[in-house]
Curated annotation (Swiss-Prot):
This is Amine oxidase [flavin-containing] B. The keyword Chloroplast does not apply. Catalyzes the oxidative deamination of primary and some secondary amines such as neurotransmitters, and exogenous amines including the tertiary amine, neurotoxin 1-methyl-4-phenyl-1,2,3,6-tetrahydropyridine (MPTP), with concomitant reduction of oxygen to hydrogen peroxide and participates in the metabolism of neuroactive and vasoactive amines in the central nervous system and peripheral tissues. Preferentially degrades benzylamine and phenylethylamine. The lineage of its organism: Eukaryota, Metazoa, Chordata, Craniata, Vertebrata. The chain crosses the membrane at residues 490-516. It comes from the Eukaryota. It is found in: Mitochondrion outer membrane. It comes from Rattus norvegicus. Gene3D superfamilies: 3.90.660.10, 6.10.250.130, FAD/NAD(P)-binding domain, Guanine Nucleotide Dissociation Inhibitor, domain 1. PANTHER family: AMINE OXIDASE, AMINE OXIDASE [FLAVIN-CONTAINING] B. Pfam families: Amino_oxidase. The modification N6-acetyllysine is found at residue 52. Residues 2-489 are cytoplasmic. The modification S-8alpha-FAD cysteine is found at residue 397.
Amino acid sequence: MSNKCDVIVVGGGISGMAAAKLLHDCGLSVVVLEARDRVGGRTYTIRNKNVKYVDLGGSYVGPTQNRILRLAKELGLETYKVNEVERLIHFVKGKSYAFRGPFPPVWNPITYLDYNNLWRTMDEMGQEIPSDAPWKAPLAEEWDYMTMKELLDKICWTNSTKQIATLFVNLCVTAETHEVSALWFLWYVKQCGGTTRIISTTNGGQERKFIGGSGQVSERIKDILGDRVKLERPVIHIDQTGENVVVKTLNHEIYEAKYVISAIPPVLGMKIHHSPPLPILRNQLITRVPLGSVIKCMVYYKEPFWRKKDFCGTMVIEGEEAPIAYTLDDTKPDGSCAAIMGFILAHKARKLVRLTKEERLRKLCELYAKVLNSQEALQPVHYEEKNWCEEQYSGGCYTAYFPPGILTQYGRVLRQPVGKIFFAGTETASHWSGYMEGAVEAGERAAREILHAIGKIPEDEIWQPEPESVDVPARPITNTFLERHLPSVPGLLKLLGLTTILSATALGFLAHKKGLFVRF
């Protein structure tokens, strides 16, 4: 069986589908080859009577994520705000503390200085890193050879700050601090708008969700493309030795095109044979960028009882014994299907896969009962979870991470074409990489690279800025005068030391002038 078209897209996630739609809209014939029995990739919306619909994969959108908002609106989708009306909870050392705002408050003055310096330093270091080429940062190699654990050991003076910083890394990239490059993580946070934007619900990356689920983005593009989207077609071979590119699938089908877009996580490239072989750096890159580990858990209740206690459902939970590190309210906008969404992250995900689904649910409910101080948390009516570690056509979630030393050596080839193969996927984005926004940016950029290759657009139109969403405008992230100018703990100690020396000198001079020194 032979199928000819202009472009073959490997991977039917949001990035691949966005690429296919743009090319289709420009009049090119496209075939999408998807390994799974569904489109959506790392977005996955299920429907049943208990949940109506629920996103078990990528779900959240917010201000400055203008491409996914534009595409979704074009497809007829609407957003709703994640509930953050009531108070948030910070659970640490067995106690719950209510707060408002993106970060838990700190009352110890020394810890506060340390805490403030942590976020300020990460944002300042991020400003030194180019979003489109992090390997060009002035101190790229120094930062890349350092793990985030090593960087946090340098920045943080108090255990409290180090622990919340570790949770921040776990939550942002579903990996441990000793696993990721400092350069890569600082870049990752920077290209998401900084520490406050990436972690926030209101005015941040988790502000909104799509009514009906994020899986509809890919599903509605599939409806547009029709039978040009082929499911259960894992690609096993790409041959560029002839005039056209020949692609073979696991079920022995042959497809032929002028160009190919690879819209899969880099590591899944190892499942595909290439003729001729991939260039050396590309061949090694795909063996060196694993995906994070996460289990997404949705616990359903009769009603959102936490709201009656003036809690919004957001919980920041510290402690090795706690299976969940972070939660959000996942109740439907009409108040139905009351639920708490929680992430089991990084090493905890790898540890808790040994338990049964029922055992994980019990641990979650016991934790929520303790954090919320409510026995109602022990009475779930339904439970859904998705262990992304077991997905052979994802390899994990949310995104691929770069261990120390990899970004500066191999980063340049991440989206560098190989012959007639162009690369998409959220990992190749320069803005909100790791999110649906990054997936759309990458897919449309790869599509425009092909449009340029065939002479339809000039080179300077490959990368295009996106107008701000009218429906979801962004408010600027601002810091107070104190947040900008408070010293770090070492800075305070130096200041106190200098003050002590100056005071002692002044007192000595005064005593000398008054003749108070005794001469022997």
